[in-house]
């Protein structure tokens, strides 16, 4: 019984001590000098939080770069192995490489050995020049940091560049069809070709653009609120502009 009473007293005293400490801290917060210090600490916490956000974005960018470099290294390593394999396993039916000299001394020639005259290789026709397709440049880390916070929301640097990559995919797919000879088109490509032509206007002449139907046709992107939010960011960064007409919004690559 006595031990229970002691435990109860100890518990009550602990609660009283907690209340006293709380009241003491509350009073400290009302003092002008301490209040100024607390406000400074709060401002510094906000600055540190912004720095941490920038650091997180930089880490994501470095990870993406590191991953790309790793893939490039693996690809080059495979190419090098293939070249070494071909070098060590040259088929016997291929002609051997002969070393020719521009100047030969008359004393070095064997008068009984006929001189071999090498015929010039036939000139190959230069390949037909392919028409280049304009693509949207990726957002840089400095540009991302300059985007207003209300536009970015929870979007990251990688999210925006992933969408740019898909938009470029749609642009390239569309204009490959437009540059393709009509005789070699399939029925599906021909239908798309006619749609592309119908969607052109005077404002889009000479420019590369896509519409939402192209995004759905050539990519796996969802044309939703998040997608349109990223389009607003791309307009802010001057990566694209909009041309409206005939019930369509055309996203022109700038």
From Swiss-Prot:
Key word Cytoplasm present: yes
Phosphoserine: residues bearing it: 241
Chain spans, region Flexiple loop that anchors MAPRE1: 91-131
Subcellular location: Cytoplasm, Cytoskeleton, Spindle; Chromosome, Centromere, Kinetochore; Cytoplasm, Cytoskeleton, Microtubule organizing center, Centrosome
Composition bias, Basic and acidic residues: 113-131
Family: Belongs to the SKA1 family.
Protein name: SKA complex subunit 1
Organism, as annotated: Bos taurus
Organism lineage: Eukaryota, Metazoa, Chordata, Craniata, Vertebrata
Gene: SKA1
């Amino acid at each position: 019984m006595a031990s229970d009473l002691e435990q109860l007293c100890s518990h009550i005293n602990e609660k009283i001590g907690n209340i006293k400490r709380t009241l003491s801290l509350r009073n400290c917060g009302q003092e002008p000098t301490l209040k100024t210090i607390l406000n400074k600490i709060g401002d510094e916490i906000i600055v540190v939080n912004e720095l941490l956000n920038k650091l997180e974005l930089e880490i994501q960018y470095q990870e993406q770069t590191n991953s790309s470099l790793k893939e490039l290294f693996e690809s080059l390593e495979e190419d090098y192995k293939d070249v070494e394999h071909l070098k060590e396993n040259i088929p016997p039916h291929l002609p051997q490489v002969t070393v020719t000299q521009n100047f030969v001394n008359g004393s070095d020639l064997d008068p009984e050995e006929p001189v071999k005259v090498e015929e010039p290789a036939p000139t190959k026709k230069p390949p037909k020049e392919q028409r280049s397709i304009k693509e949207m440049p990726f957002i840089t880390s400095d540009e991302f940091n300059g985007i207003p916070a209300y536009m970015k929301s929870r979007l990251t640097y990688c999210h925006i560049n992933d969408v740019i990559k898909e938009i470029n995919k749609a642009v390239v797919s569309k204009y490959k069809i437009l540059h393709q000879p009509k005789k070699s088109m399939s029925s599906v490509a021909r239908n798309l070709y006619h749609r592309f032509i119908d969607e052109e206007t005077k404002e889009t002449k000479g420019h590369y653009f896509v519409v939402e139907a192209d995004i759905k046709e050539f990519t796996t992107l969802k044309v939703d609120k998040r997608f349109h939010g990223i389009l607003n960011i791309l307009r802010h960064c001057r990566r694209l502009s909009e041309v409206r007409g005939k019930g369509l919004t055309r996203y022109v690559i700038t």
